[in-house]
Amino acid sequence: MTDIDVRLREDVHVLGELLGETIRQQHGDAFLQKIEDIRHSAKADRRGPGEQLSSTLADLAEEDLLPVARAFNQFLNLANMAEQYQLIRRRDADQPEPFEAQVLPELLGRLKQAGHSNDALARQLAKLDIQLVLTAHPTEVARRTLIQKYDAIAGQLAAQDHRDLTSAERQQVRERLRRLIAEAWHTEEIRRTRPTPVDEAKWGFAVIEHSLWHAIPSHLRKVDKALLEATGLRLPLEAAPIRFASWMGGDRDGNPNVTAAVTREVLLLARWMAADLFLRDIDALAAELSMQQANDALRKQVGDSAEPYRAVLKQLRDRLRATRAWAHSALTSNQPAGADVLVDNRELIAPLELCYQSLHECGMGVIAEGPLLDCLRRAVTFGLFLGRLDVRQDAARHRDALTEITDYLGLGRYADWDEEQRIAFLQAELKNRRPLLPAHFKPQADTAEVLATCREVAAAPAASLGSYVISMAGAASDVLAVQLLLKEAGLTRPMRVVPLFETLADLDNAGPVMQRLLGLPGYRAGLRGPQEVMIGYSDSAKDAGTTAAAWAQYRAQENLVRICAEHQVELLLFHGRGGTVGRGGGPAHAAILSQPPGSVAGRFRTTEQGEMIRFKFGLPGIAEQNLNLYLAAVLEATLLPPPPPQPAWREVMDQLAADGVQAYRSVVRENPDFVEYFRQSTPEQELGRLPLGSRPAKRRAGGIESLRAIPWIFGWTQTRLMLPAWLGWETALTNALARGQGELLAQMREQWPFFRTRIDMLEMVLAKADAQIAEAYDERLVQPHLRPLGAHLRDLLSQSCQVVLGLTGQPVLLAHSPETLEFISLRNTYLDPLHRLQAELLARSRSREAALDSPLEQALLVTVAGIAAGLRNTG
């Protein structure tokens, strides 16, 4: 065990001790002893077939339920914080740099050895286009208030690492830790009300303000340094290899709370926040840039000012203040922007560049390369809008709107037309100069909302918006329909309209749809930049299981690369991944390197969801590590793409996918008891009551198909069966081995990044799954006639584990990663009581009608939050 491991254990021990002291102060020694007894029972039950823990929890008095749940939840959050800090802890001089810090310099060395010239490397790095799209899927259980306290705790862990602290200073740090832990303990974990879409957007802005704002300039300094050392060339000022976008306040698919008015409000709040953040930077710069000497270009702008740099910054500061004031007043009025309001990012960047060039020309390069360069990098990356807001809506809503319009105009019903009729109508109207809608048209509420959203898109500055994403897209007409609605709303500039292919059938059909679309007269001429296509991971996995879904996603991308090349159109693939394996999640670096060759051509767009935003970008140091991984992976996938899979591998994958989907659907779709078992054995029904996201957990109607991917995954994760991530693989791999394909599978795992990544992700999720915990839920919650189904599913889980061990040749899952195994083991001591307590609470809750704010229901919600924190990638 390294010294680093020892320090992590010490941190966890100290935080646990301080939490214990806090609990003792509020609840007394006897209660703290009860917590310790529960923890020891959990450990004992892990070592043998004990029932100690369940009986201890069943005997808990009603008033103890909530504080017990809170104690274990708080400990897991503190352990998370310690683990996160561990990743960015300062190393001693004799310790190696973490992989994330070395990944780019090492890659640049390999690329040079592979024959890439210095110029080519610098050019490619400068034009990388990586977009991380922050989304507010309701898996971020922790409240923002608590997240800020946990971040402050990380700050104190860093403070106590300083070797030169006096004993008094060390005591001060411990007191601050004690106070922060007490503050967290006395703060409610669970929101009493659902967040609004605007609340979610503010949470996204907070991630930028507290973390990414600091991480980006530091990350780009290191990229610049690595490039300079490898090639002798600098990263250009205008380069922004990684930018951010958001769905918070723009994603209205299935969320009636995201209206046109909400989208307008979020766009204005982003402008207010950006102006405010840049004002802080400019104030600091104005204090520093007191120099007198300036070049002619700067003098031309400010005349004979004794402090020319401050004069330039004052002009910019005045305009930023005007922008902030206007954005604030526009939230409550329709006040138009005055001439002083900044609208174009160049208006922000140009004065900063002017100062930068002048300082260099006047021999003050060392000053130019300081905070001024950081501010410039932020201006290029975040701009006046922080990031671009995407709009997303279901294709059916556009079809319904057009049907109402054509019906009103006496043209027939758009919904009843075939694809060719729709395309002919849409193309004719897109060319037509007259408006489609008469001024006196009064649409139904749903159509009015679609049209109002399009008007907001048309009115917003181009740089404030990203893509208009069409979920459940299935035809070329779905894209043209949105283009026509945007034209009707007055949009005159190009906007990326992006079909999202998400079910298995839609993924298989993505190629033909795009072939048809790109072949339409005039369509390609209207494209400005690449054709963007979104690949859905969540719904395809829920529809067909991860075996078939992963292969369908891979094949769809291959087809799209080929078709776009045939039409001489550049392609941007947008990956709609979740935090979990069942929703396309997993380590980003490995995932990017496992994409089909040619699919990452210097461009990569992906969603970052829910709690994964906090784990990957919550602290500046961790954000920097993840930005490094993204940048290096996209550069490597662009310049050293993997070879295409061998024909024999494709045949194996075809068979694995066919066997996987059949095995998955035989359980999920064809077993008549399955839905009832799911509802009884997991907290799925109760999750709908959780005030998590602004979006309902279900679509408008239906059974398992109507359930959104998130509660579907979340429910199985809470019980540790993890079913969506592995179901189907056990049969597919067992059948392949029975066909004598073991050596071929081993070859695929060794030589094909796509297959290796799939198996690695499968192994990770199986290591977190726990049949014993899942069985405990069944025993407490499931009616006797449904229990054989649970036993069958646990047998399939065991089969999955055995076949993966056979494939990897390891004695236990994750044997190659003892540190990860140790983390899982450490967490289980605190997770086990939460799981058993949750099963007990569900049983009590279902036997009576409890009010949402009763201690019983609150305790239940806390167990959900605690398990989510303990398992991290929850949904």
UniProtKB/Swiss-Prot annotation:
E.C. no: 4.1.1.31
Keywords (alphabetical) are: Carbon dioxide fixation, Lyase, Magnesium
The cofactors named for this UniProt entry are: Mg(2+)
Q: Write the lineage as a comma-separated list.
A: Bacteria, Pseudomonadati, Pseudomonadota, Gammaproteobacteria, Pseudomonadales
Q: Which domain of life is it from?
A: Bacteria
GO BP annotations of the record are: carbon fixation; oxaloacetate metabolic process; tricarboxylic acid cycle
Annotated function: Forms oxaloacetate, a four-carbon dicarboxylic acid source for the tricarboxylic acid cycle.
Cross-referenced NCBIfam families: PRK00009.1
PROSITE patterns in the record? PEPCASE_1, PEPCASE_2
Its GO CC terms are: cytosol
Which family would the database say this protein is a member of? Belongs to the PEPCase type 1 family.
Active site residues per record: 137, 542
Q: Where are the transmembrane segments?
A: none
What is this enzyme's catalytic activity, as reactions?
oxaloacetate + phosphate = phosphoenolpyruvate + hydrogencarbonate
A molecular function (GO) term: magnesium ion binding
Protein name as annotated: Phosphoenolpyruvate carboxylase
**What cystine linkages occur within this chain?**
none
